[in-house]
């Protein structure tokens, strides 16, 4: 465990200099943007519309590097509708240096607001920050639609044993937490004050949930609950290498949000455990960085993979999650068709 040193001061200084963010930018990237570069997706539904938020395109072709938004009414056909911000917030550039894109958003709804956590990071280092933006609605046509930049949540740098990327909020019966992390110590967990969306100063410790030595270090974590257990999904291996990516998704479970999490064989995830949920299959290379959409008895796992039939392009995919008699998740067939891929690809 590790305490968040001087984070409250950093957050206060940054937030005091941040103006409210503008509405989503005008879609760019042409007609193919709806399927181009979907990485690190996070899905939610408002009304009859599903929304997927995903990492900004580092090439700037789609959305100029900002968090992308796509919508669907049926989970199969998706339309790119713009970005959360018109540009990367200047305070992030001042904190982590020049970066081409924002990473790995996580969208949730509580206390009357949509909370979007996301990261800015210098690739290959742990000079990173997790930030928060809020909105009262996701309906881009609503006059109430407006993203407010709430500033920094967790930051990291040389000397820290964690990397402040890949945020994922989880709410328990009486507490709220944020999972995050990657290389530099694996998956961490910090208590969140739901009134602010920021770390709870009465519980300032950073807890450790999962750790494996490179090259199979975990990142892209997500926690959901089912039938008395909390399930921790993580991606192991390497992302971001197209068809050379080695990502796969593994899972462990615990009776408590804070762990310890173990796999189906009882191996602790802090000791490299994890039961495989998804691996490479035909044209689907490096599946990972997934999140779980949960509504009633429905569980959907949304993730990205690299399309071997299209030069390793990053694609969105969604599958139903089902549960075995022993309480472990398994995935159903893919829901999202990808142009140019054989039937069932993804």
Model-found features: residue ranges?
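Secretory targeting and sorting signals
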Residues: 1-24
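Carbohydrate-active catalytic/glycan-binding domains of CAZyme proteins
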Residues: 24-346
């Amino acid at each position: 465990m590790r305490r968040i040193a001087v984070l409250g001061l950093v957050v206060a200084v940054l937030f005091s200099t941040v103006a409210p963010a503008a509405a989503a930018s005008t879609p760019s990237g042409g007609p193919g943007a709806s399927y181009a570069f979907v990485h690190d997706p996070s899905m939610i539904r408002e009304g009859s519309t599903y929304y997927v938020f995903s990492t900004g395109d580092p090439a700037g072709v789609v959305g100029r590097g900002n968090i992308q938004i796509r919508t669907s009414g049926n989970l199969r056909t998706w339309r790119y509708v713009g970005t959360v911000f018109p540009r990367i917030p200047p305070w992030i550039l001042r904190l982590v240096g020049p970066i081409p894109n924002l990473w790995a958003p996580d969208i949730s709804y509580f206390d009357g607001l949509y909370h979007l956590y996301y990261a800015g990071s210098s690739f290959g280092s742990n000079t990173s920050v997790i930030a928060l933006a809020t909105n009262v609605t996701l309906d881009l046509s609503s006059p109430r639609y407006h993203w407010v930049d709430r500033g920094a949540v967790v930051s990291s740098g040389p000397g820290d044993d964690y990397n402040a990327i890949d945020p994922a909020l989880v709410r328990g019966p009486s507490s709220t937490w944020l999972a995050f992390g990657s290389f530099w110590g694996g998956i961490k967990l910090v208590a969140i004050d739901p009134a602010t969306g920021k770390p709870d100063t009465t519980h300032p410790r950073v807890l450790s949930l999962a750790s494996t030595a490179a090259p199979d270090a975990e990142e892209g974590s997500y926690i959901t609950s089912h039938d008395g257990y909390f399930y921790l999904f993580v991606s192991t291996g390497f992302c971001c290498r197209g068809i050379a990516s080695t990502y796969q998704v593994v899972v462990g479970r615990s009776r408590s949000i804070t762990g310890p999490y173990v796999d189906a064989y009882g191996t602790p995830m802090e000791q490299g455990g994890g039961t495989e949920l998804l691996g490479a299959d035909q044209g689907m290379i490096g599946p990972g960085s997934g999140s779980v959409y949960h509504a009633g008895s429905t569980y959907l796992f949304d993730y990205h993979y690299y399309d071997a039939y299209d030069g390793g392009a990053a694609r969105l995919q969604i599958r139903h999650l089902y549960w075995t008699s022993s309480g472990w998740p398994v995935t159903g067939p893919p829901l999202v068709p990808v142009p140019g891929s054989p039937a069932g690809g993804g």
